[in-house]
Amino acid sequence: MQDGSSGAASLGNSSPDATDCVVCGDKSSGKHYGQFSCEGCKSFFKRSIRRSLSYTCRATKNCAIDVQHRNQCQYCRLTKCIRMGMRKEGRRSNETQTAVSAVQRGRLPVTMPSLFPPNMFLRSPFPFMSVPFNPLMTAQFTKPSIKESIFEFAAQTIFATVNWARTSMSNLVKGDQLILLRHSWTPIFIFALAQSNFALNLSTHLTAVTATAASTENGSSSLGSKSEDEEKSEEKPERVFDEPQFQGFQAKIDKIRDFHLDVVESSSLRAVLLFSCDEEALEEKGKIEEIVEKLKSAVDEYCKMNKRSERYHQICECLQLLKSTRNLPISRLFFSRLLGTTPLETILSDLLITPPPPTLPFFPQLPSRN
Protein backbone atom coordinates (compact mmCIF):
# COMPACT_ATOMS: atom_id res chain seq x y z
CA MET A 1 0.00 0.00 0.00
CA GLN A 2 2.96 2.26 0.68
CA ASP A 3 3.98 1.95 -2.96
CA GLY A 4 0.48 2.96 -4.03
CA SER A 5 0.69 6.14 -1.99
CA SER A 6 4.03 7.22 -3.35
CA GLY A 7 3.29 6.17 -6.91
CA ALA A 8 0.05 8.10 -7.09
CA ALA A 9 1.10 11.17 -5.15
CA SER A 10 1.87 13.13 -8.25
CA LEU A 11 -1.65 12.79 -9.65
CA GLY A 12 -3.10 15.78 -7.89
CA ASN A 13 -0.05 17.97 -7.32
CA SER A 14 0.30 19.72 -10.62
CA SER A 15 -2.07 20.66 -13.37
CA PRO A 16 -1.12 21.18 -17.02
CA ASP A 17 -1.56 24.70 -18.35
CA ALA A 18 -5.19 25.12 -19.33
CA THR A 19 -4.04 26.71 -22.59
CA ASP A 20 -1.78 23.92 -23.82
CA CYS A 21 -2.36 22.76 -27.38
CA VAL A 22 -4.83 19.87 -27.24
CA VAL A 23 -3.04 18.15 -30.12
CA CYS A 24 0.67 18.24 -29.30
CA GLY A 25 0.88 19.80 -25.84
CA ASP A 26 2.85 22.86 -26.98
CA LYS A 27 1.85 26.29 -25.69
CA SER A 28 -1.46 27.36 -27.21
CA SER A 29 -1.78 30.67 -29.02
CA GLY A 30 -5.54 30.73 -28.48
CA LYS A 31 -8.65 28.90 -29.58
CA HIS A 32 -8.54 27.91 -33.24
CA TYR A 33 -11.09 25.79 -35.10
CA GLY A 34 -12.96 25.15 -31.86
CA GLN A 35 -10.04 24.05 -29.65
CA PHE A 36 -6.97 25.51 -27.98
CA SER A 37 -4.02 24.84 -30.28
CA CYS A 38 -0.54 26.09 -31.07
CA GLU A 39 0.31 28.02 -34.23
CA GLY A 40 1.86 24.92 -35.78
CA CYS A 41 -1.16 22.66 -35.35
CA LYS A 42 -3.54 25.48 -36.28
CA SER A 43 -1.70 26.08 -39.56
CA PHE A 44 -1.41 22.35 -40.26
CA PHE A 45 -5.14 21.80 -39.71
CA LYS A 46 -6.07 24.86 -41.77
CA ARG A 47 -3.88 23.77 -44.67
CA SER A 48 -5.11 20.17 -44.56
CA ILE A 49 -8.80 21.10 -44.48
CA ARG A 50 -8.77 23.92 -47.01
CA ARG A 51 -6.79 21.92 -49.55
CA SER A 52 -8.61 18.65 -48.77
CA LEU A 53 -5.25 16.93 -48.35
CA SER A 54 -5.05 13.18 -47.88
CA TYR A 55 -2.26 11.57 -45.87
CA THR A 56 -0.97 8.04 -45.33
CA CYS A 57 0.51 6.57 -42.17
CA ARG A 58 3.59 4.41 -42.74
CA ALA A 59 3.24 2.73 -39.38
CA THR A 60 0.18 1.42 -37.51
CA LYS A 61 -1.96 4.59 -37.52
CA ASN A 62 -1.16 5.12 -33.85
CA CYS A 63 1.88 7.42 -33.97
CA ALA A 64 2.75 9.61 -30.98
CA ILE A 65 1.80 13.23 -31.58
CA ASP A 66 3.66 15.61 -29.28
CA VAL A 67 5.98 18.58 -29.64
CA GLN A 68 8.90 16.37 -30.66
CA HIS A 69 7.04 14.05 -33.03
CA ARG A 70 4.16 16.10 -34.44
CA ASN A 71 5.81 16.52 -37.86
CA GLN A 72 6.69 12.85 -38.33
CA CYS A 73 3.24 11.57 -39.36
CA GLN A 74 0.74 13.92 -40.97
CA TYR A 75 -1.98 11.25 -41.06
CA CYS A 76 -1.92 10.68 -37.30
CA ARG A 77 -1.57 14.40 -36.62
CA LEU A 78 -4.70 15.24 -38.63
CA THR A 79 -6.53 12.31 -37.07
CA LYS A 80 -5.73 13.61 -33.61
CA CYS A 81 -6.78 17.15 -34.56
CA ILE A 82 -10.20 15.81 -35.50
CA ARG A 83 -10.39 13.46 -32.51
CA MET A 84 -9.65 16.34 -30.14
CA GLY A 85 -12.56 18.31 -31.56
CA MET A 86 -11.02 20.71 -34.08
CA ARG A 87 -13.70 21.61 -36.61
CA LYS A 88 -13.43 23.20 -40.02
CA GLU A 89 -16.17 25.71 -39.24
CA GLY A 90 -13.75 27.18 -36.71
CA ARG A 91 -16.24 28.29 -34.09
CA ARG A 92 -18.86 26.60 -32.03
CA SER A 93 -22.31 26.88 -33.51
CA ASN A 94 -24.87 28.96 -31.66
CA GLU A 95 -26.61 25.76 -30.63
CA THR A 96 -23.43 24.35 -29.11
CA GLN A 97 -22.68 27.60 -27.30
CA THR A 98 -26.20 27.65 -25.90
CA ALA A 99 -25.94 24.03 -24.75
CA VAL A 100 -22.58 24.55 -23.05
CA SER A 101 -23.82 27.71 -21.33
CA ALA A 102 -26.93 25.91 -20.12
CA VAL A 103 -24.90 23.06 -18.66
CA GLN A 104 -22.44 25.47 -17.02
CA ARG A 105 -25.17 27.60 -15.48
CA GLY A 106 -27.37 24.72 -14.43
CA ARG A 107 -30.88 25.52 -13.32
CA LEU A 108 -31.00 23.91 -9.92
CA PRO A 109 -30.76 26.04 -6.76
CA VAL A 110 -27.15 26.72 -5.79
CA THR A 111 -27.96 25.39 -2.33
CA MET A 112 -28.57 21.92 -3.64
CA PRO A 113 -27.26 19.18 -1.30
CA SER A 114 -24.33 16.98 -2.16
CA LEU A 115 -24.55 13.22 -2.44
CA PHE A 116 -22.06 12.84 0.39
CA PRO A 117 -22.60 13.35 4.14
CA PRO A 118 -20.91 16.30 5.91
CA ASN A 119 -17.20 16.21 6.77
CA MET A 120 -16.64 12.93 4.95
CA PHE A 121 -13.03 12.43 3.89
CA LEU A 122 -12.04 9.57 1.64
CA ARG A 123 -9.20 7.37 2.81
CA SER A 124 -7.26 6.78 -0.37
CA PRO A 125 -3.68 7.04 -1.65
CA PHE A 126 -4.94 9.36 -4.38
CA PRO A 127 -4.94 13.09 -3.58
CA PHE A 128 -7.90 13.79 -5.85
CA MET A 129 -10.00 11.36 -3.78
CA SER A 130 -8.89 12.88 -0.47
CA VAL A 131 -10.71 16.17 -1.03
CA PRO A 132 -13.84 16.53 1.12
CA PHE A 133 -17.05 16.94 -0.82
CA ASN A 134 -18.78 19.50 1.38
CA PRO A 135 -22.55 19.40 1.00
CA LEU A 136 -24.44 22.61 0.54
CA MET A 137 -27.54 23.62 2.46
CA THR A 138 -30.70 21.68 1.73
CA ALA A 139 -32.85 23.43 -0.85
CA GLN A 140 -36.60 23.80 -0.88
CA PHE A 141 -37.89 22.91 -4.34
CA THR A 142 -41.00 24.47 -5.79
CA LYS A 143 -42.40 21.18 -7.09
CA PRO A 144 -41.26 21.33 -10.70
CA SER A 145 -42.59 18.74 -13.11
CA ILE A 146 -40.97 15.32 -13.09
CA LYS A 147 -39.30 15.75 -16.45
CA GLU A 148 -38.12 19.27 -15.54
CA SER A 149 -36.45 17.88 -12.40
CA ILE A 150 -34.71 15.02 -14.17
CA PHE A 151 -33.43 17.27 -16.97
CA GLU A 152 -32.00 19.60 -14.33
CA PHE A 153 -30.46 16.62 -12.55
CA ALA A 154 -28.83 15.56 -15.84
CA ALA A 155 -27.40 19.04 -16.47
CA GLN A 156 -26.00 19.32 -12.94
CA THR A 157 -24.55 15.82 -13.08
CA ILE A 158 -22.69 16.35 -16.36
CA PHE A 159 -21.20 19.58 -15.03
CA ALA A 160 -20.20 18.05 -11.68
CA THR A 161 -18.74 14.99 -13.41
CA VAL A 162 -16.55 16.98 -15.79
CA ASN A 163 -15.16 19.16 -13.02
CA TRP A 164 -14.46 16.16 -10.79
CA ALA A 165 -12.86 14.31 -13.70
CA ARG A 166 -10.72 17.34 -14.61
CA THR A 167 -9.15 17.26 -11.14
CA SER A 168 -8.79 13.48 -11.18
CA MET A 169 -6.98 13.46 -14.54
CA SER A 170 -4.96 16.65 -14.07
CA ASN A 171 -1.59 14.97 -14.56
CA LEU A 172 -2.51 13.21 -17.82
CA VAL A 173 -2.13 14.65 -21.31
CA LYS A 174 -5.27 16.38 -22.56
CA GLY A 175 -5.86 13.87 -25.34
CA ASP A 176 -6.06 11.03 -22.83
CA GLN A 177 -8.29 13.09 -20.54
CA LEU A 178 -10.84 13.52 -23.30
CA ILE A 179 -10.72 9.85 -24.31
CA LEU A 180 -11.23 8.71 -20.70
CA LEU A 181 -14.12 11.11 -20.13
CA ARG A 182 -15.93 10.12 -23.32
CA HIS A 183 -15.38 6.42 -22.62
CA SER A 184 -16.60 6.49 -19.01
CA TRP A 185 -19.31 9.14 -19.12
CA THR A 186 -22.32 6.83 -19.55
CA PRO A 187 -21.50 4.40 -16.69
CA ILE A 188 -20.67 7.33 -14.39
CA PHE A 189 -23.99 9.02 -15.19
CA ILE A 190 -25.90 5.75 -14.68
CA PHE A 191 -24.13 5.35 -11.33
CA ALA A 192 -25.22 8.84 -10.26
CA LEU A 193 -28.76 8.10 -11.45
CA ALA A 194 -28.87 4.84 -9.49
CA GLN A 195 -27.83 6.66 -6.32
CA SER A 196 -30.40 9.43 -6.78
CA ASN A 197 -34.04 9.48 -5.74
CA PHE A 198 -35.08 9.22 -9.38
CA ALA A 199 -34.12 5.54 -9.32
CA LEU A 200 -36.91 4.85 -6.84
CA ASN A 201 -39.56 5.41 -9.51
CA LEU A 202 -37.64 5.20 -12.74
CA SER A 203 -40.62 4.07 -14.81
CA THR A 204 -42.44 7.38 -14.30
CA HIS A 205 -39.35 9.46 -15.02
CA LEU A 206 -38.35 7.58 -18.15
CA THR A 207 -41.87 7.75 -19.55
CA ALA A 208 -41.68 11.54 -19.28
CA VAL A 209 -38.20 11.96 -20.72
CA THR A 210 -38.74 9.39 -23.49
CA ALA A 211 -41.69 11.36 -24.81
CA THR A 212 -39.67 14.58 -24.70
CA ALA A 213 -36.65 12.98 -26.38
CA ALA A 214 -38.74 11.53 -29.17
CA SER A 215 -40.59 14.79 -29.81
CA THR A 216 -37.32 16.74 -29.86
CA GLU A 217 -35.79 14.41 -32.44
CA ASN A 218 -38.91 14.66 -34.60
CA GLY A 219 -38.99 18.44 -34.37
CA SER A 220 -42.38 18.51 -32.70
CA SER A 221 -41.21 20.65 -29.79
CA SER A 222 -41.13 23.80 -31.89
CA LEU A 223 -43.70 26.53 -31.28
CA GLY A 224 -46.56 27.21 -33.64
CA SER A 225 -49.68 25.40 -34.72
CA LYS A 226 -49.66 22.60 -37.27
CA SER A 227 -51.88 22.29 -40.26
CA GLU A 228 -54.55 19.61 -40.35
CA ASP A 229 -52.61 17.69 -43.00
CA GLU A 230 -49.45 17.78 -40.87
CA GLU A 231 -51.33 16.47 -37.85
CA LYS A 232 -52.84 13.63 -39.86
CA SER A 233 -49.54 12.64 -41.43
CA GLU A 234 -47.52 12.93 -38.23
CA GLU A 235 -46.37 9.56 -37.02
CA LYS A 236 -46.18 8.59 -33.39
CA PRO A 237 -42.63 9.32 -32.10
CA GLU A 238 -40.44 6.26 -31.77
CA ARG A 239 -39.65 5.33 -28.18
CA VAL A 240 -36.01 5.47 -27.15
CA PHE A 241 -36.45 2.23 -25.17
CA ASP A 242 -38.79 -0.59 -26.05
CA GLU A 243 -40.35 -2.51 -23.16
CA PRO A 244 -37.71 -5.28 -22.85
CA GLN A 245 -34.90 -2.71 -22.99
CA PHE A 246 -36.57 -0.61 -20.33
CA GLN A 247 -37.06 -3.62 -18.07
CA GLY A 248 -33.39 -4.51 -18.48
CA PHE A 249 -32.37 -0.94 -17.68
CA GLN A 250 -34.58 -0.85 -14.59
CA ALA A 251 -33.16 -4.20 -13.45
CA LYS A 252 -29.60 -2.88 -13.69
CA ILE A 253 -30.47 0.26 -11.75
CA ASP A 254 -32.14 -1.82 -9.03
CA LYS A 255 -29.18 -4.18 -8.79
CA ILE A 256 -26.72 -1.28 -8.48
CA ARG A 257 -28.78 0.11 -5.60
CA ASP A 258 -28.90 -3.32 -3.95
CA PHE A 259 -25.12 -3.23 -3.42
CA HIS A 260 -25.63 -0.41 -0.86
CA LEU A 261 -22.19 1.07 -1.49
CA ASP A 262 -20.82 3.40 1.18
CA VAL A 263 -19.17 6.72 0.35
CA VAL A 264 -15.64 5.29 0.09
CA GLU A 265 -16.75 2.41 -2.10
CA SER A 266 -18.80 4.71 -4.33
CA SER A 267 -15.99 7.22 -4.83
CA SER A 268 -13.44 4.49 -5.50
CA LEU A 269 -15.74 2.76 -7.97
CA ARG A 270 -16.39 6.03 -9.79
CA ALA A 271 -12.64 6.61 -10.11
CA VAL A 272 -12.07 3.08 -11.45
CA LEU A 273 -14.81 3.69 -14.03
CA LEU A 274 -13.11 6.90 -15.14
CA PHE A 275 -9.69 5.34 -15.67
CA SER A 276 -10.78 1.93 -17.03
CA CYS A 277 -10.25 2.25 -20.76
CA ASP A 278 -8.60 -0.01 -23.33
CA GLU A 279 -8.56 2.47 -26.22
CA GLU A 280 -5.42 2.04 -28.31
CA ALA A 281 -5.30 5.80 -28.91
CA LEU A 282 -4.27 6.45 -25.28
CA GLU A 283 -0.79 7.96 -25.12
CA GLU A 284 -0.14 7.10 -21.46
CA LYS A 285 -1.88 3.74 -21.38
CA GLY A 286 0.65 2.16 -19.02
CA LYS A 287 0.32 4.99 -16.53
CA ILE A 288 -3.47 4.78 -16.63
CA GLU A 289 -3.47 1.00 -16.12
CA GLU A 290 -1.20 1.48 -13.11
CA ILE A 291 -3.68 3.95 -11.62
CA VAL A 292 -6.51 1.44 -12.01
CA GLU A 293 -4.52 -1.32 -10.30
CA LYS A 294 -3.66 0.95 -7.37
CA LEU A 295 -7.27 2.01 -7.04
CA LYS A 296 -8.40 -1.62 -6.94
CA SER A 297 -5.72 -2.43 -4.36
CA ALA A 298 -6.92 0.46 -2.21
CA VAL A 299 -10.50 -0.83 -2.38
CA ASP A 300 -9.36 -4.36 -1.50
CA GLU A 301 -7.45 -3.07 1.52
CA TYR A 302 -10.43 -1.00 2.61
CA CYS A 303 -12.64 -4.09 2.51
CA LYS A 304 -10.13 -6.14 4.50
CA MET A 305 -9.74 -3.32 7.02
CA ASN A 306 -13.48 -3.56 7.66
CA LYS A 307 -13.24 -7.37 7.86
CA ARG A 308 -15.44 -7.84 4.82
CA SER A 309 -13.19 -9.68 2.37
CA GLU A 310 -16.17 -10.84 0.28
CA ARG A 311 -17.16 -7.21 -0.22
CA TYR A 312 -14.37 -6.64 -2.75
CA HIS A 313 -15.87 -9.24 -5.10
CA GLN A 314 -19.29 -7.61 -4.77
CA ILE A 315 -17.80 -4.23 -5.71
CA CYS A 316 -16.11 -5.82 -8.73
CA GLU A 317 -19.48 -7.26 -9.74
CA CYS A 318 -21.02 -3.80 -9.50
CA LEU A 319 -18.15 -2.43 -11.61
CA GLN A 320 -18.84 -4.94 -14.39
CA LEU A 321 -22.54 -4.16 -14.23
CA LEU A 322 -21.86 -0.45 -14.68
CA LYS A 323 -19.47 -1.10 -17.56
CA SER A 324 -22.23 -3.00 -19.33
CA THR A 325 -24.27 0.23 -19.52
CA ARG A 326 -21.71 1.97 -21.74
CA ASN A 327 -23.81 1.75 -24.91
CA LEU A 328 -27.14 2.86 -23.44
CA PRO A 329 -28.70 5.84 -25.29
CA ILE A 330 -28.59 8.22 -22.33
CA SER A 331 -27.82 11.20 -24.56
CA ARG A 332 -31.18 10.78 -26.31
CA LEU A 333 -32.95 10.04 -23.05
CA PHE A 334 -31.71 12.76 -20.73
CA PHE A 335 -30.05 15.44 -22.84
CA SER A 336 -32.13 15.78 -26.01
CA ARG A 337 -33.87 18.97 -24.92
CA LEU A 338 -30.71 20.54 -23.50
CA LEU A 339 -28.35 19.68 -26.37
CA GLY A 340 -30.65 19.55 -29.38
CA THR A 341 -28.59 18.07 -32.22
CA THR A 342 -25.25 18.92 -30.59
CA PRO A 343 -23.32 15.69 -29.85
CA LEU A 344 -22.79 15.06 -26.14
CA GLU A 345 -19.10 14.41 -26.90
CA THR A 346 -18.76 18.01 -28.09
CA ILE A 347 -20.20 19.34 -24.83
CA LEU A 348 -17.89 17.11 -22.78
CA SER A 349 -14.89 18.35 -24.73
CA ASP A 350 -15.83 22.02 -24.38
CA LEU A 351 -16.59 21.71 -20.67
CA LEU A 352 -13.31 19.89 -20.03
CA ILE A 353 -11.20 22.77 -21.37
CA THR A 354 -13.34 25.47 -19.74
CA PRO A 355 -12.08 26.66 -16.31
CA PRO A 356 -14.53 25.70 -13.54
CA PRO A 357 -16.30 28.20 -11.28
CA PRO A 358 -14.87 28.60 -7.76
CA THR A 359 -17.47 26.46 -5.95
CA LEU A 360 -19.33 23.39 -7.16
CA PRO A 361 -21.50 20.68 -5.66
CA PHE A 362 -20.47 17.12 -6.40
CA PHE A 363 -23.01 14.59 -7.62
CA PRO A 364 -26.46 16.05 -6.95
CA GLN A 365 -29.26 14.22 -5.25
CA LEU A 366 -32.72 15.64 -5.51
CA PRO A 367 -35.05 15.40 -2.51
CA SER A 368 -37.77 12.77 -2.55
CA ARG A 369 -41.04 13.78 -4.16
CA ASN A 370 -43.84 13.02 -1.77
Swiss-Prot record:
It comes from Caenorhabditis elegans. Residues 18-93 bind DNA. Transcription factor. Involved in motor neuron fate determination and maintenance, acting as a transcriptional repressor to counteract gene activation by transcription factors unc-3 or irx-1 in subsets of motor neurons. Probably acts by binding to specific promoter elements. Required for ventral D (VD) motor neurons to adopt their normal synaptic pattern. Suppresses expression of flp-13 in VD motor neurons to ensure formation of the correct synaptic pattern. GO terms for biological process: cell differentiation; cell fate specification; intracellular receptor signaling pathway; negative regulation of inflammatory response; negative regulation of transcription by RNA polymerase II; neuron remodeling; positive regulation of transcription by RNA polymerase II. One of its GO terms (molecular function) is nuclear receptor activity. Residues 226-240 have a biased composition (Basic and acidic residues). This is Nuclear hormone receptor unc-55. Belongs to the nuclear hormone receptor family.
